[in-house]
């Protein structure tokens, strides 16, 4: 068979031993000779498989506590040797061709993620022989198959069975790509880890501002889907995800029905889901163009959805809806009967809800899984020729963090609304103003160049939907540079304001609140969002 290569000898040396015994048995049953090292060789030998230790094959023992195992010409000559072209020199040095290499690498990421991991621990989990064999086999994919993922074991055996114990070039090439991706990610993790130690060059990174970010930033994402287009129809696009995306994210979500997700669908769904995660009560967030246009909590999801929708039914048309509880049939029925929706996402979806939404085949229904702790990692923003990297904004305040700076004190009900409103403001594009009352947004002013106009827009939105502003609270994602935003809020009927404070004119702004008989609370925390 043209470009197919028979598999007669395989070298197996894996850190993650998932499925390796079954794979080795399958290879042995097909007449493949097995070479192996260390723990892998012991596992295979204990299972009764005929296996040759690499040290017996090379005539050179493992040494230096296993640091040197496979770095030998008889190993790499067998992997890198070009069939036909190098046969004579291989025979001269008694080098056997190695047709398949099965390797995955020391668990560096898992090691450095452990509490108390020392530099010495990290160093000992830097694989040397493994990546060298992987790269050698991938380089010589014309003749050699390299397998780095347990998920590929079954398809390798299936193809061998279909092709007389041979693998096609297309398969070997695909496996080689996976191998280079594997070593690239591995080296990137190591570079990131050591890069955070500059300039301390040691275990103790406390107090080093530079240590939060490595000298070079390496990250790897796996393509999840190609898209019809990007943000606009003239832009090509694709969606990439982290290899181990955490549950409770758009990247890990399973699509239960509907059209393929678009670029804008994914961006908006992420915004809605991250916002709804802030609430412990049953909550609903409706997003349009990455901005919450309606957010509410309730005793149940249906109540939360009804109240979120009431904020701005006009903007909710064609929006994204996120929940923090299992989507039930009653809530799904209300959505389908009431509005056109692009995406619905929830931790889980009941069978009744699935059946209801199935009546609208184009609606994208996503089940994201339940989240626990906030996802770690960085926020990344591409700029022309560069990349901005920052810690994710996990900042939030509790009632005990608030500082009342006005003469009037907030009531308990107002304090609850202030904290609710503050959570929403964190996810609104700056300049952000949010009006809320009794756990429901009643007006959102987003993305304006001046804060006072965001305040005016929030009031207009509430008025247009017939919602009562009187007695409501207002959140601002950043400080008020002038009193005009407070005057606009007072004119609309706002009774309490929550904001970071920190302006040169704070006293002027506080005085304005006192003049209007309003409560003002400082958080000492800003939530810009661009």
Swiss-Prot record:
**Enzyme nomenclature, EC number:** 2.1.2.3, 3.5.4.10
Which pathway does the record list? Purine metabolism; IMP biosynthesis via de novo pathway; 5-formamido-1-(5-phospho-D-ribosyl)imidazole-4-carboxamide from 5-amino-1-(5-phospho-D-ribosyl)imidazole-4-carboxamide (10-formyl THF route): step 1/1; Purine metabolism; IMP biosynthesis via de novo pathway; IMP from 5-formamido-1-(5-phospho-D-ribosyl)imidazole-4-carboxamide: step 1/1
Among PROSITE patterns, the record links this protein to: MGS (PS51855)
Domain MGS-like as annotated: residue spans: 1-148
Recorded GO terms, molecular function? IMP cyclohydrolase activity; phosphoribosylaminoimidazolecarboxamide formyltransferase activity
SMART domains hit by this protein = AICARFT_IMPCHas, MGS
Which reaction equations make up its catalytic activity?
A: (6R)-10-formyltetrahydrofolate + 5-amino-1-(5-phospho-beta-D-ribosyl)imidazole-4-carboxamide = 5-formamido-1-(5-phospho-D-ribosyl)imidazole-4-carboxamide + (6S)-5,6,7,8-tetrahydrofolate; IMP + H2O = 5-formamido-1-(5-phospho-D-ribosyl)imidazole-4-carboxamide
**Any one GO BP annotation for this protein:** 'de novo' IMP biosynthetic process
Q: Which Gene3D superfamilies match?
A: 3.40.140.20, Methylglyoxal synthase-like domain (3.40.50.1380)
Q: Which UniProt keywords apply?
A: Hydrolase, Multifunctional enzyme, Purine biosynthesis, Transferase
One cellular-component annotation, GO: cytosol
What does UniProt say about this protein's domains? The IMP cyclohydrolase activity resides in the N-terminal region.
The UniProt family comment states: Belongs to the PurH family.
Q: What is this protein called?
A: Bifunctional purine biosynthesis protein PurH
Q: What is the lineage of its organism?
A: Bacteria, Pseudomonadati, Pseudomonadota, Gammaproteobacteria, Aeromonadales
The record's gene field reads purH
């Amino acid at each position: 068979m043209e470009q197919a290569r028979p598999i007669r000898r395989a070298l197996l040396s894996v850190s993650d031993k998932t499925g390796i015994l079954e794979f080795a048995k399958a290879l042995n049953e097909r007449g493949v000779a097995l070479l192996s090292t260390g723990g892998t060789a012991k596992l295979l030998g204990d299972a009764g498989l005929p296996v040759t230790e690499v040290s017996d094959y090379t005539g050179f023992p493992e040494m230096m506590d296993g640091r040197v195992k496979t770095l030998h010409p008889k190993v790499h000559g067998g992997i890198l040797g070009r069939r036909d072209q190098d046969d004579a020199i291989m025979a001269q040095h008694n080098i056997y061709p190695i047709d398949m290499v099965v390797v995955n690498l020391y668990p560096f990421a898992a090691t450095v993620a452990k509490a108390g991991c020392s530099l010495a621990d990290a160093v000992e989990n830097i694989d040397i022989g493994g990546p060298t064999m992987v790269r050698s086999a991938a380089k010589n994919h014309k003749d050699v198959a390299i397998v780095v993922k347990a998920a590929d074991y079954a398809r390798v055996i299936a193809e061998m069975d279909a092709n007389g114990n041979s693998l096609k070039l297309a398969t070997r090439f695909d496996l080689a790509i996976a191998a280079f991706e594997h070593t690239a990610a591995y080296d990137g993790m190591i570079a990131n880890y050591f890069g955070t130690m500059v300039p301390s060059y040691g275990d103790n990174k406390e107090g080093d501002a530079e240590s939060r970010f490595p000298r070079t930033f390496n990250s790897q994402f796996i393509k999840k889907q190609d898209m019809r287009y990007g943000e606009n129809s003239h832009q090509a696009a694709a969606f990439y995800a982290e290899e181990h995306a955490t549950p409770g994210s758009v990247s890990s979500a399973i699509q239960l029905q509907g059209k393929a997700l678009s670029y804008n669908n994914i961006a908006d769904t992420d915004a809605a889901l991250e916002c709804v995660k802030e609430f412990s009560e049953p909550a609903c967030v409706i997003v349009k163009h990455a901005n919450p246009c309606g957010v509410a909590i309730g005793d149940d999801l249906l109540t939360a959805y009804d109240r979120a929708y009431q904020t701005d039914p006009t903007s909710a048309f064609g929006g994204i809806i996120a929940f923090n509880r299992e989507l039930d049939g009653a809530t799904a029925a209300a959505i389908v009967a009431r509005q056109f929706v692009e995406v619905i996402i929830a931790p889980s979806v009941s069978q009744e809800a699935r059946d209801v939404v199935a009546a609208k085949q184009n609606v994208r229904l996503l089940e994201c899984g339940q989240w626990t702790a906030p996802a770690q990692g960085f926020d990344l923003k591409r700029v022309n020729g560069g990349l901005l990297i920052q810690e994710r904004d996990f900042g939030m305040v509790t009632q005990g963090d608030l500082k009342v700076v006005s003469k009037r004190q907030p009531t308990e009900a107002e304090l609850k609304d202030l904290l609710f409103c503050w959570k929403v403001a964190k996810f609104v594009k700056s300049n952000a103003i949010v009006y809320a009352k009794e756990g429901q947004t009643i007006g959102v002013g987003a993305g304006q160049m001046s804060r006072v106009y965001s305040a005016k827009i929030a009031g207009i939105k509430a008025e247009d939907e017939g919602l009562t502003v009187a007695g409501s609270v207002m959140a601002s994602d950043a400080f008020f540079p002038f009193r005009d935003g407070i005057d606009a809020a007072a004119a609309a009927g706002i009774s309490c304001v929550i904001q970071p404070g920190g302006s040169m004119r704070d006293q002027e702004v506080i005085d304005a609140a006192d003049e209007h008989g309003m409560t003002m609370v400082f958080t000492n925390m800003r939530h810009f969002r661009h």
